[in-house]
Swiss-Prot record:
Keyword Disulfide bond part of the UniProt annotation: yes
Record-level GO cellular component terms: endolysosome membrane; endoplasmic reticulum membrane; endosome membrane; external side of plasma membrane; Golgi membrane; plasma membrane
The protein's name: Toll-like receptor 8
GO annotation, biological process: canonical NF-kappaB signal transduction; cellular response to mechanical stimulus; defense response to virus; immunoglobulin mediated immune response; inflammatory response; innate immune response; negative regulation of interleukin-12 production; positive regulation of canonical NF-kappaB signal transduction
Length: 1041
């Protein structure tokens, strides 16, 4: 029995091991890129690994990758094995490693800078670009490949630049060494070995800005085209410094001897506030120069001789100096006939607030000038005569007069500019014009001495940006695209009179934001500029009390009225928006962040031309209140609307009727950042053109069972930042149009494969899942297999698709999860039925063996005998009349056999019976089994003296089977039972034998007077054949067969 169980257990274990090994083979390789996102772009293969919390270079990067971005990680070591096998790399970005900014989220990471083994990049023979910015490197890495053409070491701790580090890089074209020793670094000076750059004969760009140099490095290669020496503490530029740089096109010397007043960073001026000393012949060999930056060098005079040999100079930056006098005289301007951009911003005299601006007549010589920046000159009034020198410039298209605190301006002067496209007057003090008189409520004699800082107070500067020059577009590109632009934002035009813009009839883009305007527009204010197409009135206090507002602007296409909530918040004030219906060309209307919760008289918006409406940041939760049906159709009249933004409206639910009254022409619907717990998906059937549905930032708990039942046009579905915990099976079953599905930042613990399977060809190309608390058990394996089967579906930032449970998997990506111990459902079913079958069979076999063993054995032998027929065997010679089998270990039984049974059979007066006894007749030295077989075979009968104990012993069973074997082999029934105790009461064999040959079963009598009869009967049974005493009824029935 035990052996049978052992064998079945071993078989089961072997089967499980085989199944597990198959699973291991199937799961150990994943074809989806991880932890990086790999993509093809033109002829390049790019691996995007930035900001993935990596602590080492991943070994899973494909060997065909050409560009590898490892920036913003926690990598601390680069070794010779880091890029092994990546011989195709042409660009490596290791900027910001370790990422100190985000180190608090990984306290186990020690940040001592990036440690690079010598020669770690040497075997990358195709490497062209190597970016190692902000890595706390103490020196230039050694053993760099000669193939490098660009090397960036910005924001490190490199204080010594020697030939040993870069002399071998003969193919280098761009070298960035800026921001290594600047104002917040503990260093005294940057040491540059003499002639260190001399051997770099192909070098075209060299950046040494924000280092403590004190002088221009000597022996610079003549191949240089761009040289950045900003904020390098250089006080003197000699005639020899740039003598050999005949190919130089860009030179940045800004920040040397800086103007430090109001500086938003630690600033050290030159002694006595002196300006940088530039030799008059310092630039005489720079004949190819196109760009020169002398900003913040405390210049008070401009030497015209500097520009004598600069015939191609196009951009000149002179910001943050003391050049008010030079702007007035302008002798140097005569040397710049091809100058296109001139920046003279923030050259004001501290404490001075002149009435007018004074510019030189020599400005008229700048015939190629396209943009003039004069921010921060600081004056009170701009007259036509002041800009007379500029009016004849044929190419001038941009005038920047921002942050000048101008109070009055004669707009008529701008009519004299033939090609002017951008007029930037933001952040001044321009007041309303009423009856040709400027209204000023400011003290004209006062001047705000606190000039706005030229840079943000944020010390995290962009090392790649122009440190002093304002690089953002002056005007929104969307606005400037319509034509001539005027920016009057952040002024004091709190009232617009009919004559305000009478001298600017050709304005197409107008920005009047942040003027504290609380006017009731009546439809006449902009009559002088009827061709305006883009109007920005944001951040004012406009009162929409007149239904004719803005109707004079018949060509208006974009109207921005956002952040005018002042009067919309007041319930008792009239709120008219029906003026919108008067615009026949209006395409975009922005009413966001106005807290609109009530309208007057007319409750619906109407427009036949409007294409886009931004209604975010209002109070639709009140407008669509269950108890108020007036605004149910507020958007129904917008017949051609394609994009509607209803975000940030505090909506907890959307009435079905209100949703059905949205324009059927919608292609984009944004309902993000509300408080919706339920969304009626069935209503999407009313929008046959809807392509984008944005439901981000709500509290949705459930999704529809089948999206295809309600929309066939949807391409983008955004559901991030909700509370969705389950993705229904069949969610995308027949959706063929959906391309982008965003399920990030929800409560999904697992995703069933059936939820993403489609019956038709799917177009799904983007699936976002990061930020979900996935439960990484074997149930996630189904989704993992789907990921491997659908490589065309991009899952961005797989490193952020992480496990929340169980504890040992917490924080791991589901892609890195080891699922080899998991068994598939099919395999699990097969194993279950297999083990169930084996276990059941073993149990049934054990039960049958216990209950029906003899019956089976007997039937088997009867059948076998029937098949083989009767064969007479030669009978062995017998010496004994009977062999007595008894329990020799039982003293009472042994005594009964020797003194009673032997006496009455062998020593009786009647015919004696010769018995074979174990303790008397067995041969010494012969094996027990041999003695037993010999005793049974040499005796005519075998008598079993049975007790309860002996009937259970193996000795009895062995002797019984041997005696029974004679019946099979010799057809001789030799068995006789003497029952000293009632035993084998339920034995099928004993019951059958009692029916066939009852006399062969004797029981020791309880009555002593019956013992004589017992001995006589035993003697007769031993001396006669058993078959002569068979019950004829049974014998005859057997003989028939």
């Amino acid at each position: 029995m035990e052996n049978m169980f052992l064998q079945s257990s071993m078989l089961t274990c072997i089967f499980l091991l085989i199944s597990g090994s198959c699973e291991l083979c199937a799961e150990e390789n994943f074809s989806r890129s991880y932890p990086c996102d790999e993509k093809k772009q033109n002829d390049s293969v790019i691996a995007e690994c930035s900001n993935r919390r990596l602590q080492e270079v991943p070994q899973t990067v494909g060997k065909y990758v050409t560009e590898l971005d490892l920036s913003d990680n926690f990598i601390t070591h680069i070794t010779n094995e880091s890029f092994q096998g990546l011989q195709n790399l042409t660009k490596i970005n290791l900027n910001h490693n370790p990422n100190v900014q985000h180190q608090n989220g990984n306290p186990g990471i020690q940040s001592n800078g990036l440690n690079i083994t010598d020669g770690a990049f040497l075997n990358l023979k195709n490497l062209r670009e190597l970016l190692l910015e902000d890595n706390q490197l103490p020196q230039i890495p050694s053993g760099l490949p000669e193939s490098l053409t660009e090397l960036s070491l910005i924001q490190n701790n490199i204080y010594n630049i020697t030939k040993e580090g870069i002399s071998r890089l003969i193919n280098l074209k761009n070298l960035y060494l800026a921001w290594n020793c600047y104002f917040n670094k503990v260093c005294e000076k940057t040491n540059i070995e003499d002639g260190v750059f001399e051997t770099l004969t192909n070098l075209e760009l060299l950046s040494l800005s924000f280092n403590s140099l004190s002088h221009v490095p000597p022996k610079l290669p003549s191949s240089l085209r761009k040289l950045f020496l900003s904020n390098t503490q250089i006080k003197y530029i000699s005639e020899e410094d740039f003598k050999g740089l005949i190919n130089l096109t860009l030179l940045d010397l800004s920040g040397n001897c800086p103007r430090c007043f109001n500086a938003p960073f630690p600033c050290v001026p030159c002694d006595g506030g002196a300006s940088i000393n530039i030799d008059r012949f310092a630039f005489q060999n720079l004949t190819q120069l196109r760009y020169l930056n002398l900003s913040s060098t405390s210049l008070r005079k401009i030497n015209a001789a500097w520009f004598k040999n600069m015939p191609h100079l196009k951009v000149l930056d002179l910001e943050f100096n003391y050049l008010v006098g030079e702007i007035a005289s302008g002798a140097f301007l005569t040397m710049l006939p091809r100058l296109e951009i001139l920046d003279l911003s923030f050259n004001y005299i501290k404490g001075s607030y002149p009435q007018h601006i004074n510019i030189s007549r020599n400005f008229s010589k700048l015939l190629s000038l396209r943009a003039l920046h004069l921010r921060g000159y600081v004056f009170q009034e701009l007259r036509e005569d002041d800009f007379q020198p500029l009016m004849q410039l044929p190419n001038l298209s941009t005038i920047n007069l921002g942050i000048n605190f101008i109070k009055q301006i004669d707009f008529k002067l701008f009519q004299n500019f033939s090609n002017l496209e951008i007029i930037y007057l933001s952040e001044n003090r321009i007041s309303p014009l009423v009856k040709d008189t400027r209204q000023s409520y400011a003290n004209s004699s006062s001047f705000q001495r606190h000039i706005r800082k030229r840079r943000s107070t944020d010390f995290e500067f962009d090392p790649h940006s122009n440190f002093y020059h304002f690089t953002r577009p002056l005007i929104k590109p969307q606005c400037a695209a319509y034509g001539k632009a005027l920016d009057l934002s952040l002024n004091s035009i709190f009232f617009i009179g009919p004559n305000q813009f009478e001298n600017l009839p050709d304005i197409a883009c107008l920005n009047l934001s942040a003027n504290s305007n609380a006017q009731v527009l009546s439809g006449t204010e902009f009559s002088a500029i009827p061709h305006v197409k883009y109007l920005d009135l944001t951040n004012n206090r406009l009162d929409f009390d007149n239904a004719s507002a803005l109707t004079e602007l018949s060509d208006l296409e974009v109207l921005d009225l956002s952040y005018n909530s002042h009067y919309f918040r007041i319930a008792g004030v009239t709120h008219h928006l029906e003026f919108i219906q008067n615009f026949t060309n209006l395409k975009v209307l922005n009413l966001s962040h106005n807290n609109i919760y009530t309208l007057t008289d007319k409750y619906n918006l109407e427009s036949k031309s409007l294409v886009e409406l931004v209604f975010s940041g209002n109070r639709l939760d009140i407008l669509w209140n269950d108890d108020d049906n007036r605004y149910i159709s507020i958007f129904k009249g917008l017949k051609n609307l394609t994009r509607l933004d209803l975000s940030l409206n505090r909506l907890k639910h959307i009435p079905n009727e209100a949703f059905l009254n949205l324009p059927a022409s919608l292609t984009e619907l944004h309902i993000n950042d509300n408080m919706l717990k339920f969304f009626n998906w069935t209503l999407l059937q009313q929008f046959p053109r809807l392509e984008l549905l944005d439901l981000r930032g709500n509290k949705l708990l459930f999704l529809t069972d089948s999206l295809s039942d309600f929309t066939s046009s949807l391409r983008t579905l955004l559901l991030s930042h909700n509370r969705i915990s389950h993705l229904p099976s069949g969610f995308l079953s027949e959706v063929s149009s959906l391309k982008h599905l965003d399920l990030s930042s929800n409560l999904l613990k697992t995703i069933n494969k059936s939820a993403l399977e489609t019956k038709t060809t799917t177009k799904l190309s983007m699936l976002e899942l990061h930020g979900n608390p996935f439960e990484c058990t074997c149930d996630i394996g189904d989704f993992r297999r789907w990921m491997d089967e659908h490589l065309n579906v991009k899952i961005p930032r797989l490193v952020d698709v992480i496990c929340a449970s169980p504890g040992d998997q917490r924080g791991k990506s589901i892609v890195s999860l080891e699922l080899t111990t998991c068994v598939s459902d099919v395999t699990a079913v097969i194993l279950f039925f297999f083990t169930f079958f084996i276990t059941t069979m073993v149990m049934l076999a054990a039960l049958a063996h216990h209950l029906f063993y003899w019956d089976v054995w007997f039937i088997y032998n009867v059948c076998l005998a029937k098949v083989k027929g009767y064969r007479s065997l030669s009978t062995s010679q017998t010496f004994y009349d009977a062999y007595i089998s008894y329990d020799t270990k039982d003293a009472s039984v042994t005594d009964w056999v020797i003194n009673e049974l032997r006496y009455h059979l062998e020593e009786s007066r009647d015919k004696n019976v010769l018995l074979c006894l174990e303790e008397r007749d067995w041969d010494p030295g012969l094996a027990i089994i041999d003695n037993l077989m010999q005793s049974i075979n040499q005796s005519k009968k075998t008598v079993f003296v049975l007790t309860k104990k002996y009937a259970k012993s193996w000795n009895f069973k062995t002797a019984f089977y041997l005696a029974l074997q004679r019946l099979m082999d010799e057809n001789m029934d030799v068995i006789i039972f003497i029952l000293l105790e009632p035993v084998l009461q339920h034995s099928q064999y004993l019951r059958l034998r009692q029916r066939i040959c009852k006399s062969s079963i004797l029981q020791w009598p309880d009555n002593p007077k019956a013992e004589g009869l017992f001995w006589q009967t035993l003697r007769n049974v031993v001396l006669t054949e058993n078959d002569s005493r068979y019950n004829n009824m049974y014998v005859d029935s057997i003989k028939q067969y």
